[in-house]
Amino acid sequence: MQAAGHKLPILPRKDDPGTERYMEYFYKYCADLLFKPLMTLQEWKTCKEATLLMTREETNRYVYLCDLLHNFVLQHLFRSYFYVTSSNILPRVATLLKGRDKHLRHCEFSNTFDHILHFMFPFSTAAFRIFRLLLKQNNPNSHAQLMKHDILKPILDMTSQELRRDNLLSCSCQEYFENMRKV
């Protein structure tokens, strides 16, 4: 935009005070209740099971919660970052990478091709999607959280399991490390 030949600075968008109050209330009182099923999972370091077995209902619940967490991290940068760091939820989400169901480990359709693959593989995994987003956001504090909880280890384990397969999960793991190289 220009006014009288001068460029106007682009100011960050300020939310409506009502929206701000709602967001504050949500993250203070509701987020813990919403993500309680994720918080009941063991941290990936203490989970002794090689493969996490769950019922279809549990799997669906965790897929939906991971999708919600992904969208919150994507849309509410500051508040979601504070929630993720203060709640210690990332090591529990990493436990889902041990899931038997691939759709629990990985869910990704960030472009048209991925959206098509999502219909071909309707249960693409949701947990890995969160870690990919945190990497792509290129936030040093988020990277520090991933390193603090040693999240790379379960991602490497999952990658080594899928290494010889030519599937969406294997390609996404390769893309994760390619993005890591670029960051």
What is the predicted function of each stretch?
Residues 1-183:
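Extended alpha-helical scaffold regions
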